Amino acid sequence: MKYPFMATRGVITFIGNSSTIEVGRPLSLAAIDLAKSDFENKLVLIPQKNIKQNEIEFEKDLENVGILTKIKSIKILSNGNRKIIVEGVERIKLDSIEKDKNNNDIIANLSLYPVLKNENGSSETIIEKMQTSLNNIIESNLPLVANQELSKHESSERYTYILAHYLTMPFEKKFEIFAKKSLTEMLELIFSFLVELKNIQKLDVDLDKDIKKNLDSQQREYLLRERLKVIQKKLGDDENDEEEIEEKLNSKYGKEQYPEEVIKTIKNEKRRLKNMMSSSPEANTSRTYIEWLTNLPWRKVSVDKTNLVKSKEILDSYHYGLKEVKERIIEFLAVMINNNKKHPEDEKTKIQIPNSDYEINKNLFTKKNASDDTYSYKSSNNVPILALVGPPGTGKTSLAKAIAETLDRKFIKISLGGVKDEAEIRGHRRTYVGALPGKIIQAIKKAGVSNPVILLDEIDKMSSDYKGDPTSAMLEVLDPEQNVNFQDHYIELEYDLSKVLFIATANYYQNISAPLLDRVEIIELSSYTSLEKIRIARDYLIKKVLEQNSLEESQFKISDESLDFLIKHYTLEAGVRNLQRALDKLARKIVVKSLENKLEKDFVITSEEIVNLLGVIKYTDDFKENYERIGAVNGLAYTQYGGSTLSIEVTTFPNSKGGIKLTGQLKEVMQESAQIALAFVRSNAKKYEIDFNFEANQIHIHVPEGAVPKDGPSAGVTFTTAIISALKQIPVSHKVGMTGEITLRGKVLPIGGLKEKSLAAHKLGIKTVFIPNENNRNLVEVADEVKESIEFISVSDYDEIFENLFGKLSDNKKITSNSKIPKKDISKANPTH
């Protein structure tokens, strides 16, 4: 006879018994489909000789005895596998294997291999012997359903199959029983296995007397741990834990620290815990929950410093500049001091914890009325939620640490980069295995107070997926109107975050969602100028480098000129991280020289020494093109890494289709900007005396560094100038840069990031920058050293740029690298309000 077959690993099914098998191998799935469609759900199971082997070569890898089964049910799993339940029908012997119509080796040629029954009653004799001497062993090693079936067995054959099927034993042993020819031989093997099992259990009972010395280290450790549990229970350690919690709740400060609702929840949970088995998973979950509730600080806060002079000194000791953010923190401190003066009654609600810098603030977790469901707060308790936005290396994280030290508060950092799951913020519900509170509650527990400074690092790097949107969860955290009633899914009680000072950091505020951006106070940390970097290196970085490398000041003498050389030729960044790395590398080289006795007592680091120690110069003053070309113009860009220059190139060539071609990974807005620029030039070709056949030639616009995606409308005037330069065949000086959005009517619209863009122009050596007239007010933000080296020309219409660069065609006036650009007096331009 022929039936589809499936190789099994570690599964033996006896006649009349059912087995559940998860199937995933392609041939096995094909055999199931064939059995279902053509063989009335009949499927042969043949055990593999090696259960660890995944791929088999059939006859040589299979046992020659198997069982014909009937498939009772099939369930498709989420991973594509199937779970089948089969019932044993007949024992068979495998003769050969052949292919099905799909060329799969899944058809087995079989012959029946029935179990021989002894007629002399030997089977019944063995069964009676088992029931007399081994009944306790049988009952304790079989599930309830198997014991029930044994009690009502109809034949010795059925009794044998039930025992063999349900007893837990090694696969090899079970197959040995399965393959025996006669029922008596099967029973003899089962009997010997049960006797062996009985002896093992007897050894366990007499463990301390007989084989304690022979226990291996793992068994001994397990035994000791089990005994320790019993000893702890006898000594009442669990009761001690309960007493500790009770003492904490009922102490003088505990009653004030924990809100009534929290105490009530803890007591209810303790009552539930008493009714649970101590070893049950629910009990462990309950104990962990009680620990979290008792270990959270609730009304416990640290005492804020209120000395404005000392606070200013601390902020200045950490960072150079950053006037705006320092002023904001001083304002917050001033308001807090003023509130304490105006509302002295608030001090009565604070209880100082003896011999500590902490106090209990009874204003926290307070309801206006007993009937209220949520907590209330006073407006004077509002704490600013700051977002420090700036390029990498500009001191955002270290500034947050300085703020924490200024306020004398605990500082906790939460990294949000790559967070995709809402539960990371709000926590998991306690029904999940291994559930924990979210990052906010974990940070507060770690701080041990309810008013820490929490740094939400890289808030612009959060993203969402099918698990939820963590950005939306952050809305509740960062909204002063809502965070007084923040609810974590694990804690399930409202937690007042109104005293927490949240400081978020981001590289690019455009990457922060609009609702989240609306809830924070943006403070921009812009790129540093060369002079600022020199000052930072002199006042902060060099001291740190000398300390880390154990060098004396005399061994690391470096002038401002050498620092400027190092900054310009070995770093190209908005912040100072690479500058610190370069200084650190110099220090390490000097340490090596010192240990090799190749260093003079006083070592002066000149520009020549920098090249000797750090190697070839990485960046030069003319690393961009330093000559004028037709159709090439310098644009200015603002990215999350600071300002940068953007060279735009235009060329033309004959093409009957005409039109425009754009390359350089330009995104949608920038593509539209280029198309608007071309449309403006075409519509004003006569006005600008452009003699060009647009229908017979194609215009190709390219922005170099094609691997980097680019977007934004601020390159509009640059596109326009590059197109006119290419069409009129008049070059534009490489010392000229520009930024501004252009309209179809030629109006120049304002742009963002002027400070960053002007710094990029300054680094490149650009001497003239055209900016939109409405950006005049932003010039006050530009560093003086930049304004001294760059002439800013404000324009409201493109005609003004054209007249400056190309002049009137009649006198062929144009700007070259050797000619002076006419200045416009912008010194009197006042910022608009």
Swiss-Prot record:
<dbReference type="GO" id="GO:0004252">
    <property type="term" value="F:serine-type endopeptidase activity"/>
</dbReference>
<feature type="active site">
    <location>
        <position position="714"/>
    </location>
</feature>
<comment type="subunit">
    <text>Homohexamer. Organized in a ring with a central cavity.</text>
</comment>
<dbReference type="InterPro" id="IPR054594">
    <property type="entry name" value="Lon_lid"/>
</dbReference>
<dbReference type="GO" id="GO:0004176">
    <property type="term" value="F:ATP-dependent peptidase activity"/>
</dbReference>
<dbReference type="InterPro" id="IPR027065">
    <property type="entry name" value="Lon_Prtase"/>
</dbReference>
<dbReference type="GO" id="GO:0005737">
    <property type="term" value="C:cytoplasm"/>
</dbReference>
<dbReference type="InterPro" id="IPR008269">
    <property type="entry name" value="Lon_proteolytic"/>
</dbReference>
<dbReference type="GO" id="GO:0034605">
    <property type="term" value="P:cellular response to heat"/>
</dbReference>
<feature type="domain" description="Lon N-terminal">
    <location>
        <begin position="3"/>
        <end position="198"/>
    </location>
</feature>
<dbReference type="InterPro" id="IPR015947">
    <property type="entry name" value="PUA-like_sf"/>
</dbReference>
<dbReference type="Pfam" id="PF00004">
    <property type="entry name" value="AAA"/>
</dbReference>
<dbReference type="InterPro" id="IPR003111">
    <property type="entry name" value="Lon_prtase_N"/>
</dbReference>
<dbReference type="InterPro" id="IPR020568">
    <property type="entry name" value="Ribosomal_Su5_D2-typ_SF"/>
</dbReference>
<comment type="similarity">
    <text>Belongs to the peptidase S16 family.</text>
</comment>
<dbReference type="InterPro" id="IPR014721">
    <property type="entry name" value="Ribsml_uS5_D2-typ_fold_subgr"/>
</dbReference>
<keyword id="KW-0067">ATP-binding</keyword>
<keyword id="KW-0346">Stress response</keyword>
<dbReference type="InterPro" id="IPR027417">
    <property type="entry name" value="P-loop_NTPase"/>
</dbReference>
<dbReference type="InterPro" id="IPR003959">
    <property type="entry name" value="ATPase_AAA_core"/>
</dbReference>
<dbReference type="GO" id="GO:0006515">
    <property type="term" value="P:protein quality control for misfolded or incompletely synthesized proteins"/>
</dbReference>
<dbReference type="Pfam" id="PF05362">
    <property type="entry name" value="Lon_C"/>
</dbReference>
<dbReference type="InterPro" id="IPR046336">
    <property type="entry name" value="Lon_prtase_N_sf"/>
</dbReference>
<dbReference type="Pfam" id="PF02190">
    <property type="entry name" value="LON_substr_bdg"/>
</dbReference>
<keyword id="KW-0378">Hydrolase</keyword>
<keyword id="KW-0720">Serine protease</keyword>
<dbReference type="GO" id="GO:0043565">
    <property type="term" value="F:sequence-specific DNA binding"/>
</dbReference>
<feature type="active site">
    <location>
        <position position="757"/>
    </location>
</feature>
<dbReference type="InterPro" id="IPR003593">
    <property type="entry name" value="AAA+_ATPase"/>
</dbReference>
<comment type="function">
    <text>ATP-dependent serine protease that mediates the selective degradation of mutant and abnormal proteins as well as certain short-lived regulatory proteins. Required for cellular homeostasis and for survival from DNA damage and developmental changes induced by stress. Degrades polypeptides processively to yield small peptide fragments that are 5 to 10 amino acids long. Binds to DNA in a double-stranded, site-specific manner.</text>
</comment>
<keyword id="KW-0963">Cytoplasm</keyword>
<feature type="domain" description="Lon proteolytic">
    <location>
        <begin position="627"/>
        <end position="808"/>
    </location>
</feature>
<dbReference type="InterPro" id="IPR004815">
    <property type="entry name" value="Lon_bac/euk-typ"/>
</dbReference>
<feature type="binding site">
    <location>
        <begin position="390"/>
        <end position="397"/>
    </location>
    <ligand>
        <name>ATP</name>
    </ligand>
</feature>
<keyword id="KW-0547">Nucleotide-binding</keyword>
<dbReference type="GO" id="GO:0016887">
    <property type="term" value="F:ATP hydrolysis activity"/>
</dbReference>
<dbReference type="Pfam" id="PF22667">
    <property type="entry name" value="Lon_lid"/>
</dbReference>
<keyword id="KW-0645">Protease</keyword>
<dbReference type="InterPro" id="IPR027543">
    <property type="entry name" value="Lon_bac"/>
</dbReference>
<dbReference type="GO" id="GO:0005524">
    <property type="term" value="F:ATP binding"/>
</dbReference>
<protein>
    <recommendedName>
        <fullName>Lon protease</fullName>
        <ecNumber>3.4.21.53</ecNumber>
    </recommendedName>
</protein>
